[in-house]
Amino acid sequence: MTEHILTNARVVLCDEVVRGTVQLRDGCIASVDPGRSSVPGALDLEGDLLLPGLVELHTDNLERHLMPRPRVFFPAQSALQSHDAEIAAAGITTVFDAIGVGDPYDEGARAQDQSAILQVMDLLEDAGVLRSRHYVHIRCELPAPNARELFEPFAHHPRLKLLSLMDHTPGQRQWSDIEHARVYYTGKKGWSEQKFEHELRLAPQRQAEHAQPNLRWFVDFARAHGLALATHDDTTVAHVDEAQA
């Protein structure tokens, strides 16, 4: 049995903050008591705040480590360990790592099979290397013709807990202002003006062909498998009403 005692802490409870002591036994909270502990070996937190671990539902931080620059791919094990260290340092003990599937423009990591990260998560967790608990949040790009295909390797893995539905078609939601989309794609993505205008012309047709069929498929899948479902970049009351429906 492993036991730790944290004392002289400002312990954040559900309805108050108390100066007290927390006893941990085999990785679980055994007791929370007011006052200081005189037990030898108790760790004095000197009045620091002691909070429950945070739960992060949506972070792109893992993707950032896997591809720190456009078209630059980092080894998955090193990327996950760096990401995990940052997450733990921020007080996050449970993280839903967001991984995008599907790219209407067929470029970047989201246009590729990224499911190898699942095996890396399992490997590092089994080795006791990871500090935080990692689940997977799959972000489904609805206008992408390859969204379902790239989702398939994740579909039945026990780490999959959350799906969110995205549509980054220029002219609506996040890209309601076309000029903002232009700055992003020509700046961060390195597109030429000609490529941006070309993709802008194709986007409505791609959306009309794939977005609704993919939406229905992913919603049905989430409901059938008991997965949490979220929407993305809702910017109007109509978007919220659509999400609730």
Regions found by a protein language model. Give the residues of each.
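Metal-associated gating/positioning segment near the N- to mid-region
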Residues: 48-117
